[in-house]
Amino acid sequence: MRSLQMLLLAALLLGTFLQHARAARATNVGRECCLDYFKGAIPIRKLVSWYKTSVECSRDAIVFLTVQGKLICADPKDKHVKKAIRLVKNPRP
């Protein structure tokens, strides 16, 4: 019974660690990296600003901020993303 408790505790700690690692902050950058790209239509009218992910991130991405405060990770090579970048007037530094 004691070994089962230890196994469950280890699984819980591992799960907590993996969940934290999923946030994927780049080292010494302070910004998050994108793990996947948004696959839907980008709501251009709801976009407020955008920024590029750090060069330290493993995946190049554009991050759009919506009026609701949501972040959308997008592929910078996608033609719809390029159009959205042109239309959004306030890129963040």
Curated annotation (Swiss-Prot):
GO terms for biological process, alphabetical: cellular defense response; chemotaxis; immune response; inflammatory response; negative regulation of myoblast differentiation; signal transduction
Signal peptide from the UniProt entry: 1-23
Record-level GO cellular component terms: extracellular space
Subcellular location field: Secreted
UniProt entry keywords in alphabetical sequence: Chemotaxis, Cytokine, Disulfide bond, Inflammatory response, Secreted, Signal
Main location: secreted
Assigned protein family: Belongs to the intercrine beta (chemokine CC) family.
Protein name: C-C motif chemokine 17
Record organism: Mus musculus (Mouse)
Gene name, Swiss-Prot/TrEMBL: Ccl17
